[in-house]
UniProtKB/Swiss-Prot annotation:
It comes from Kitasatospora aureofaciens. NAD(+) binds at residues 55, 144, 166-169. PANTHER family: FLAVIN REDUCTASE, FMN REDUCTASE (NADH) RUTF. Signal peptide: none annotated. It catalyses: a reduced flavin + NAD(+) = an oxidized flavin + NADH + 2 H(+). FAD binds at residues 46-52, 72-73. Belongs to the non-flavoprotein flavin reductase family. Catalyzes the reduction of flavin by NADH. Subsequently, the reduced flavins is transferred to the tetracycline 7-halogenase CtcP. InterPro entries: Flavin_Rdtase-like_dom, NADH-dep_flavin_reductase, Split_barrel_FMN-bd. This is Flavin reductase (NADH).
Length: 191
């Protein structure tokens, strides 16, 4: 059974910036865009777009995602104790928008397969990498829960050139420079 979320016992409210100012500050930080997925008790897939994801530790391999405490996906994820983080590729804006919108069936027309470690949904398209995780810890922080996942499976997809980014409330693509070794091979082949 996954751990119950702990809560930060601090009263931080006095003297803080307002929410809009905070979002403007954080919007200046470019982030990757992920879709966090899990399965509900009935085996139904759940997922949401998440830009608050990052690595925590190499040994053991841990990552974290931050999810709104009112989210149905968070509830399913904590009950299941397993989830996947699907890192979207440049051009994956429509997938990000689908999983960010309040629609009934976010997985309609989305290609995915059961992950190798726990069967949670791993997206088959629009991703540069994925990580399958077991919930290691959860901490309520304000209106979100920080979920720490122990990475049990996953990997990059080297054939996909660049990730999707989010900056100042807009999508962007990471600029990809051509690998000089590949460029030399291409020039040699073209001769």
């Amino acid at each position: 059974m996954p751990p119950e979320p702990l809560s930060l016992p601090l009263d931080l409210a006095p003297g803080l910036v307002d929410g809009d100012t905070f979002l403007s500050i954080m919007g200046a930080l470019p982030t990757g865009v992920t879709v966090v997925t899990t399965l509900g008790p009935d085996g139904e897939p759940y997922g949401l777009t998440c830009s608050a994801a990052c690595s925590v530790s190499k040994a053991p391999p841990l990552l974290l995602v931050c999810i709104n405490r009112d989210s149905r996906v968070l509830k399913a994820l904590l009950e299941r104790g397993e989830f996947a983080v699907n890192v979207l590729r440049g051009g994956g804006e429509s997938t990000s928008a689908r999983f960010a919108a309040p629609v009934d069936d976010r997985f309609r027309d989305v290609r995915w397969e059961p992950g190798s470690a726990g069967g949670v949904p791993v997206m088959s398209a629009d991703v540069v990498a994925h990580a399958e995780c077991r919930v290691a810890a959860a901490l309520d922080a304000g209106d979100h829960t920080i979920v720490i996942g122990a990475v049990v499976a996953g990997g990059p997809r080297p054939e996909v050139p660049s990730p999707l980014m989010y900056w100042r409330r807009s999508y962007a693509r990471w600029p990809v420079e051509e690998d000089p070794r590949t460029a030399a091979l291409t020039l040699a082949a073209e001769g």
